Amino acid sequence: MRLLITLGPSGSTHGHSLHTDAGRRRGGRPFAQVVDELRAGQRVRTQGLKGAARGHVLARLHGALRAPLVCVAVDEEAADALAADLSFFLGGQGSLLAPRVLRLPADEVLPYDEVSPDAAAVTERLGALFHLGQGTRFPALVLSVRALHRKVLPLAVMRALAARVAVGQDFDRDSLARRLVRMGYQNSPLVEDVGTFSVRGDLLDVFSPLYDKPVRLEFFGDTIESIRAFDPQSQRTVDALKEVDLVPAREVLLTDETRPRAESAARAVADRINLPTIKLREQLDALREGLPGFGMEGLLPGFFEDGLSTVFDFLRDWSPEAPVIYLDDPLGQDRAADTLWEELERSHGAAEARQELICPPLEHFLSREDVNQRMQSFRVLEGGGLSLAQTERPPVHFSFGGTQDLREAILAHHGEEGALSPLVERLERWRELRVACVVACGTLSQADRLKRLLMDRNVMVKVHTEPLEDAVALYEPSIRAHLFTGEVSHGFVDGPGGLAVLADEEIFGARARRRPKRSKKLDAFGSGFGDLKEGDLIVHTDFGIGRYAGLTKMEVNGVPGDFLVLEYAGRDKIYLPVGRMRLIQKFSGGDPTQVQLDKLGTTSWEKTKKRVKEQLLKMAAELLQIAAARKAHPGHAFSAPDRYFAQFEADFEFEETPDQAKAIEDVLADMQKPEPMDRLVCGDVGYGKTEVAMRAAFKAALDRKQVAVLVPTTVLAQQHFLSFKKRFADYPVTVEVISGLKKAPEVREILKRAKEGKVDILIGTHKLLGGEVAFKELGLMIVDEEQRFGVKQKESLKKWRSQIDVLTLTATPIPRTLHMSMSGVRDMSIIATPPQDRRAIRTFVMKYEDTVVKEAIEREVARGGQVFFVHNRVESLPSIETQLRALVPQVSIGVAHGQMGEGQLEKVMLAFTEKKYQVLLCTSIIESGIDISSANTMIVNRADQFGLAQLYQLRGRVGRSKERAYAYLLVPSRRAVTKDAQRRLEVLQNFTELGAGFSIASHDLEIRGAGNLLGDKQSGAIAEIGFDMYAQLLEEAVAEMQGQPPKVQIEPDVTLPMPALIPDDYVSDVHQRLVFYKRFSQASHPDEVTDLRAELVDRYGEAPDEVDHLSELTLLKIDMRDLRLRGLEVGTTRLVVTLGADALLDGPKVAGLVQRSKGVYRLTPDMKLIARAPQGASGQDLISEAKKVLRDLSHCALPQA
């Protein structure tokens, strides 16, 4: 039987016959024709091949021809979309080592732009070239016109430098390290970033661009004994490997071979352009130092004997089966090539005028003629758009149906409970026509959400966790939709193929696209001891604030040990054994230059601690009082989220971060309780706090309750109004704002409607707290940046807190330690995970040039955007303003700085948010909460004078929309920047993923945040005693107010007759030694000690005896802390345990132990237990004896111990 039904766009009945015969379904005449013509070696033109249908057809083409595909798109954005479509139909993107769809990215900058290219793009390109050069088999390579024209590292160089290293292979470790330097890797004490390596003893760590994790090679002599992948954050092994491929880490390779060639190329260019000797010397110095500075890319072809290679050279050797080249939108590609060459000529001309040392464009890029000529030896398929090339036959027509009408039908019902009805009806119609429907969901959680929404409507769906392998074999009569994770550009209907594909964006609206990236958690373990430098302030629990003066070796009773030298007022010193590092913290929380050192032998430190503790007890009492009043006051218990709420959640255009999802869960759980909510949500700008507030507001509106949103400034009021309005546009929720911008009659009208219950969400400044504002049924108050309100406003907020649900938001990061200390008195949710890059901010480090500034501003303004120009000196702002007005006279410029009056500053900021200015020239004052999605370029002048954390905060002000954001970090010429600053600027360039340097810098921001949250008085206390001590005292105060017994903390003093330390020749980096000492001293469970020793072995090789002794000493201390014993002295003839008055021991039981021991134990009047050591015992025997003594004492412990 043959069933004939016709199906056109979106399921309408015309267009193609649809057969039940699976074989015919797979073919389809246009497809078969394309296959036949390509097999015959012809250039094939198609029409109607666009969107995700391209991926579908190309994937089938790969299967039919068994040939790899080289897919060329107009630009990088189009290449990303094409790669996503292909990945979806080719069974996923694969991994870095076994790719299925590989991207060969181009640089956004030209070699003459004085800007080093984006490091992530460089490493991704080198990885792709390696795979091509090695002949790795994979289905598809995707690149843009620019990447196809751009010349690349010579194939011979890639092959000569790349190294495959395997377990069991003989390889001289030092020669491998030298080879890595030649390949552009940088030696670093800790391997956290791509392109770095480190040598320690028998270990070599290296992070190759081919892997998403660094690897650790362990040598035995010259033989590689093991290869292990490790986590760059924890530095611990995660996987064992048999072999590893090492590829060049950068393109500007300054090696012994390339440097002389680069120098002679530089001299030749200098002679041709008559370059002054001083300028030539500066460039040659940079080359000799091996510093890849700005603009060195322009000379790159001169580094190699035969110049650079082309992508075609790599393609020729890639696959035994000649690849098929697919040109997407050939006419668009012609235009892109024209534009590229226009930009090249212009940029080259400008560089020549600046007398830069550069090679001509044809040495960097292929001409259009070259590309066309080289393409003639490949089979070519054209699709999408028009073509200018002549082909022997007319174009092959594909006529896929679209899904636009379905999108429009869903939009027409958006915000209503039945919004998904058009989708449900369409799925039913497709099922009747035996069409399998596939939905590409951006994430697994989005797939689960859509499944719930459809299952609620009795629609059977299936969520697939594996990538899509064969779309044609999917049809199942009972399943209406198959949900896969992945992205497609937009949907299509293939009637004859029995397949309909939808993007989740067509159901829920546009979502932010992301490219996968190497993950890096931002967390500074070891409480900042990894960067403790001589001269830094520390806080000792018993002696107060001192200065760290280094790590030194000393002998005590003939036993060597490591000691921290701590300096106090009057040059007094303490030598602290590393085993007692638990007693100190790095000082943070105030200006180090204003801090006074404590004086040893006085009571001043104890008095300060006592005073702060009294303050804290008062604060804790107040907080607990508010919490108690809240619990006593019955509030409104909101209903649980329903189907309609789930639809609102699904409309969120980003994937929730784990912290954000947890905050939403916390808030909704609080709202469902009968007592009023009082929750604080902390998170940096852009971390998604507003969405948490919007979910709470929607829940309140669904329960017919009104919401007040209180903000500190008119600017933020206006911003929140616009973002709430946009988010609730498709729902029956009324949002209004009252602020200084509204005329009095308008305000009166809004207030009247609020009183009548006709306004669901009212946003405003402190005016909302005034007597003239009344609500019919207020159920939720959202407070943004509470610390910026005055005392009076804070007092009225206290009154509200015990009556209705209050949700407070703050952009200031809050440290986890403070969060822990305050648990029980303040409900807090911390959003510490940054959102996955909407699109990574392109960060350029470059020399200040007027042309750079002019082009950056003009480029942003031309696409309708705005620019922040940050200059941190108020006194020179007017001269910068004059300079900018001369450079870009047609652009409107606003000026903002902290010395302006608040009203004036607010006016300028508001005008900028309303797009009345295109450029905002400002100091680093840019308001913390400000979110201007149209401002996507930031220029920072003298970036070398900013700290990492400050630059991170600034940079977070751009990149808040789907537009690509740019950050230009401008520095003076190379001569004015120190070598150290230059290396730091390289870190800044890889800024999309910050390493430990940022984690530590962020600590300071958190401390500032703690002060903001707790108020000025508490900031003063933090500055006086340091943050960690403050958090500890706060925890004690809260426990005391809650009636818990005070914790007695004892730090036992243990001496062993053998060295217990980490030898310098085992861990040579002093910072890493300090981190390990700190972690050993903090260990509170035997498992932690076992893990620490295992980590040392993993990272540094087999542990020497001294490390084993340190582990044993730490284990003894853990047992002693449990019993609150003060000291233990292990000698060759006896062991002495100092019990002390706080010991958790039962006196009679200890006396009984001594009596039963028959002279082995004796107790002295000053509470010391002396045990006789076995004759001739030493080393491990003595430690075993010490453990036995502590075990005996544990049998005498008081019941509560």
UniProtKB/Swiss-Prot annotation:
Region (Disordered): 1-27
Binding site for ATP: 683-690
Keyword terms, alphabetized: ATP-binding, Cytoplasm, DNA damage, DNA repair, DNA-binding, Helicase, Hydrolase, Nucleotide-binding
Disulfide bonds: none
Domain (Helicase ATP-binding): residue spans on this chain: 670-831
Signal peptide stretch: none
Subcellular location, record wording: Cytoplasm
SUPFAM superfamilies named among the record's database cross-references: CarD-like (SSF141259), P-loop containing nucleoside triphosphate hydrolases (SSF52540), TRCF domain-like (SSF143517)
InterPro entries tied to this protein: CarD-like/TRCF_RID (IPR003711), CarD-like/TRCF_RID_sf (IPR036101), DEAD/DEAH_box_helicase_dom (IPR011545), Helicase_ATP-bd (IPR014001), Helicase_C-like (IPR001650), Mfd (IPR004576), P-loop_NTPase (IPR027417), RecG/Mfd (IPR047112)
A GO term, aspect molecular function: ATP binding
Annotated GO biological process: regulation of DNA-templated transcription; transcription-coupled nucleotide-excision repair, DNA damage recognition
Family: In the N-terminal section; belongs to the UvrB family. In the C-terminal section; belongs to the helicase family. RecG subfamily.
NCBIfam families: mfd
Function: Couples transcription and DNA repair by recognizing RNA polymerase (RNAP) stalled at DNA lesions. Mediates ATP-dependent release of RNAP and its truncated transcript from the DNA, and recruitment of nucleotide excision repair machinery to the damaged site.
Protein name: Transcription-repair-coupling factor
Native organism: Myxococcus xanthus
